[in-house]
Amino acid sequence: AMLDQIETEGWLRAKAVVGIWPANAVGDDVELYPSPAGAASAATAALPVAAEAAPAAEVMRRLHFLRQQADKPPGRPDFCLADFIAPRESGVRDWIGAFAVTAGLGIDAHVARFEAAHDDYSSILLKALADRLAEALAEALHERVRRELWGYAADEALDPQALIDEGYRGVRPAPGYPACPDHTEKGTLFALLDAPGNAGMALTES
């Protein structure tokens, strides 16, 4: 099976980078501030979910989010991701995390080999497997963030079905999906994480 070949012959390499930063909401935007001393962007220690502190003067980056535009019955608000971060005027220092993962390093040579042999099936299958492996890596890394790197759910013990049902604490939105439809925020995230330098990842034109 191709999945066995990927593993035994080392066709693909996986890499990931994660960052956790102080943050506050300003309207529909989220301001990110430099991490305090000892809390590097590729965090290895637990950080508080929220702590009383005066907002930092330096804004490192801004994430721009869009508010829902749906017609809803009275009493049902249109949400924005910024609603889930403490407002700057609250005086509460909140935090935000992000990560980028890939399981496709090394794939180009094998795709080219299949396409040169007019083996479209194997080319498509390899791309699909790399995509699924990246999704699995994202799931595993998100769990490690919750339990270890950020540590806000250190005692979490979810079974596979609970993970599928997203029964964990927190959310994992991604640019290009309904909660964050603006693809341009990928550039901001890649810059924050230095995804090219830390994980060998690059954004495509699409």
PLM features: what roles do these ranges have?
Residues 114-118, 139, 153-206:
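Activity-critical C-terminal alpha-helical subdomain
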Residues 1-124, 128, 146-149, 158-160, ...:
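Active-site loops and adjacent core secondary-structure elements that bind or stabilize anionic groups
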Residues 134-147:
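Charged, low-complexity helical/coil segments in non-catalytic cytosolic or luminal regions
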